[in-house]
Design a protein with these regions (language model features):
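Active-site neighborhoods and metal-handling regions in enzymes and metal-associated proteins
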Residues: 1-441
Length: 441
């Protein structure tokens, strides 16, 4: 279960209810199970919005929040009934009797009876909040219940006349992390950092990329994070220039770099770190020259990110650092200001500098036009500058095929930011020292 307290989940539900109209109900559905092949399923992963309000990790569940008026509201959970045979085969179920105490909801009803029960809860209300289009099974249930109400006027049934998507409201709530959430994210960052450190220590020429992937996942598991928060990227050599490379199947060669973008999922929350280091433990001059530009971009971002700034504003400073550095190396040619105006950096830095982080690795929340939203305390985001010199790029030969990204996770505080992932080294000399020490053991 979640390390978020029951009281926090109750506060979140109350915060949503306070933004709902009187005479309304919000329906939040659990994620369905997903088939991997034939009769095998992927490990179950709960819908992040449902988890945000419940911390409940079973499928076939619906949270119903009902606001009768400004002073009366209640919560109902539909979930699976206890079934001893099913539980022998597939694991324990919470059931209805234990759910109110465990989850802090007012009452629990059997999911198998939702078509018979939900229409009674919605009868006479004016508004239903529902994330239409998210899950087909959820739409089928909601549409069936509403149609039953519409056709039941002779039985004194009335359907809500308005349907509103709750996602804009909920996703704005999720953008601002509570102290409890930040504590879990901090732990996710610590575990992820330990895994990246392990990868640096274990790396040797002749290993395959999937060997480091295994080392990383092993470290996640050792600390109670069973799954990565996204598909792990271990790209050596030219593979580091592929942003979402996940094949992880090539032999790592002496003299190449390896870019690892990996994060654990801990109690539902994501870590997300990237480190790039030499397979043999020693940067070449060309690798170091590109690395220093990326590192300066990251360190400048960490100094600048604070309340009142924006991703757009900080990105502008990073682009100037990158363009200036690439001009000095002869990779770009011309006036720095003119090159920036021409977006000349885009072939080498083609992704965003930052994204929100939380229950989803690319977390929800509005960024604003061109990521111009002003940052506020409680927002959690990544900082991930990178430079990728394609193998066939028209640049000095020594730089071709070099891909470097360095990424940390930060939370915006009242006075600046806290780096949640600072415990894994990123300065070149520190990386080399760590890898050299590991080789002596």
């Amino acid at each position: 279960m979640s390390e978020i307290s029951r009281q926090e989940f109750q506060r979140r539900r109350q915060a949503l209810v306070e933004q709902m109209q009187p005479g309304s109900a919000a329906l939040i559905f659990a994620a369905p199970e997903v088939t991997r092949s034939a009769d095998s399923e992927y490990p179950y992963r709960q819908n992040s919005d449902f988890w945000y309000f419940t911390g409940f990790n079973e499928p076939e569940a619906v949270l119903v929040l009902i606001k009768s008026d400004d002073t009366h509201n209640h919560s109902v959970l539909f979930n699976r009934v206890r079934d001893l045979t099913a539980e022998i085969w597939f694991g324990r179920r919470l059931g209805q009797d234990a759910a109110p105490e465990k989850l802090g909801v007012d009452r629990a009803l059997a999911f198998s009876e939702i078509n018979q029960q939900l229409y009674q809860l919605l009868n006479g209300l004016d508004v239903v909040y529902h994330a239409q289009g998210e899950y087909a099974y959820a739409d089928e249930i909601v549409n069936s219940v509403l149609e039953k109400l519409r056709k039941g006027s002779r039985q004194n049934l009335t359907a809500p006349a308005t349907m509103i998507d709750w996602r804009p409201v909920v996703h704005e709530m999720r953008l601002f992390k509570s102290p409890e959430e930040i504590a879990v994210l901090r732990r996710a960052g610590e575990i992820t950092a330990m895994a990246h450190t392990r990868a640096m220590e274990k790396c040797r020429p002749g290993m395959f990329e999937y060997h480091l992937e295994g080392e990383i996942h092993h470290e996640f598991n050792r600390h109670g994070a069973r799954y990565p928060s996204y598909n792990t990227i271990v790209g050596s050599g030219e593979n580091g220039c592929i942003l979402h490379y996940t094949e992880n199947e090539c032999e790592m060669r002496d003299g190449d770099l390896v870019l690892i973008d990996a994060g654990c999922e801990y109690k539902g929350y994501a870590g997300d770190i990237t480190r790039t280091f030499p397979v043999n433990g020693k940067f070449t001059q060309a690798q170091r020259e590109i690395y220093d530009i990326v590192l300066e971009s990251l360190e400048t971002s960490l100094r600048l990110y604070r309340p009142g700034t924006s991703i757009l504003e900080v990105t502008g400073e990073v682009v100037r650092i990158m363009v200036s550095g690439l001009v000095k190396l002869g990779i770009l040619k011309g006036d720095v200001d003119e090159l920036i105006a021409q977006n000349a950096h885009r072939p080498f830095f083609m992704h965003g500098l930052s994204h929100w982080l939380g229950l989803d690795v690319h977390d929800v929340g509005v960024y604003g036009q061109d990521r111009s939203r002003i940052l506020e305390p409680g927002m959690v985001l990544t900082v991930e500058p990178g430079l990728y010199i394609a193998p066939d790029a028209d640049v000095p030969e020594q730089y071709r095929g070099i891909g470097i990204r360095i990424e940390d996770d930060i939370v915006i505080t009242e006075t600046g930011n806290e780096n949640l992932t600072a415990s894994v080294v990123k300065k070149p000399e520190e990386i080399e020292a760590l890898m050299a020490a590991a080789r002596k053991q």
